[in-house]
């Protein structure tokens, strides 16, 4: 029997795949558990339509991420932190601080999508990577300045 998987099933395939399985496996386990539906002409057409819509949606999200990446590449953020006389920070600059600086510029990115190569513990210029979409990553340039110069 041919079925369309609604969920990822180990050893069978991913959601949306059309696979052939034994009738008993489909009727007694996969279909009652909501893991699959029968592959009829109507469901196959609906699956194709859904895949096309999903592809359009993903392409639009990718385009938006690329536009945002261009905007971010042109920015140089300023992150303010308390520092001693030697330029050593009292603490570290984290991805949350960079996300907050981006937010102040009107760009919302989740802090978990921003990665620093090494802990930032000194004043100066640095780079961080921000993953905007599946295959769209951008370098975020930021400068750490002493908090006293911010006021």
Curated annotation (Swiss-Prot):
SUPFAM superfamilies referenced in this protein's UniProt entry, alphabetically: L9 N-domain-like (SSF55658), Ribosomal protein L9 C-domain (SSF55653)
Claim: Ribosomal protein is one of the keywords in the record: yes
Any GO BP annotation: translation
Membrane spanning residue stretches: none
GO molecular function, one term: structural constituent of ribosome
One GO CC annotation: ribonucleoprotein complex
Pfam family of the protein (one): Ribosomal_L9_N
InterPro entries noted in UniProt: Ribosomal_bL9 (IPR000244), Ribosomal_bL9/RNase_H1_N (IPR009027), Ribosomal_bL9_bac/chp (IPR020594), Ribosomal_bL9_C (IPR020069), Ribosomal_bL9_C_sf (IPR036791), Ribosomal_bL9_N (IPR020070), Ribosomal_bL9_N_sf (IPR036935)
Keyword annotations of the record: Ribonucleoprotein, Ribosomal protein, RNA-binding, rRNA-binding
Gene3D superfamilies: Ribosomal protein L9, C-terminal domain, Ribosomal protein L9, N-terminal domain
HAMAP family: Ribosomal_bL9
Protein family per UniProt: Belongs to the bacterial ribosomal protein bL9 family.
Task of the protein: Binds to the 23S rRNA.
Record-linked PANTHER family: 50S RIBOSOMAL PROTEIN L9
Protein name (record): Large ribosomal subunit protein bL9
Protein's organism: Chlorobium limicola (strain DSM 245 / NBRC 103803 / 6330)
């Amino acid at each position: 029997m041919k079925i369309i998987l609604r969920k990822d099933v180990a050893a069978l395939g991913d959601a949306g795949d059309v696979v052939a399985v034994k009738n008993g496996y489909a009727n007694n386990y996969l279909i009652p558990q909501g893991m699959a539906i029968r592959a009829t002409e109507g469901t196959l057409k609906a699956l194709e339509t859904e895949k096309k819509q999903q592809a359009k949606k993903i392409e639009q999200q990718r385009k938006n991420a690329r536009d945002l990446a261009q905007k971010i590449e042109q920015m140089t953020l300023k992150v303010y932190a308390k520092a001693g006389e030697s330029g050593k920070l009292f603490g570290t600059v984290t991805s949350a601080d960079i996300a907050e600086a981006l937010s102040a510029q009107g760009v919302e990115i989740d802090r978990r999508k921003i990665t620093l190569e090494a802990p930032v513990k000194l004043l100066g210029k640095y780079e961080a990577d921000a993953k905007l979409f599946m295959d769209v990553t951008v370098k975020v340039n930021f400068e750490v300045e002493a908090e006293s110069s911010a006021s």
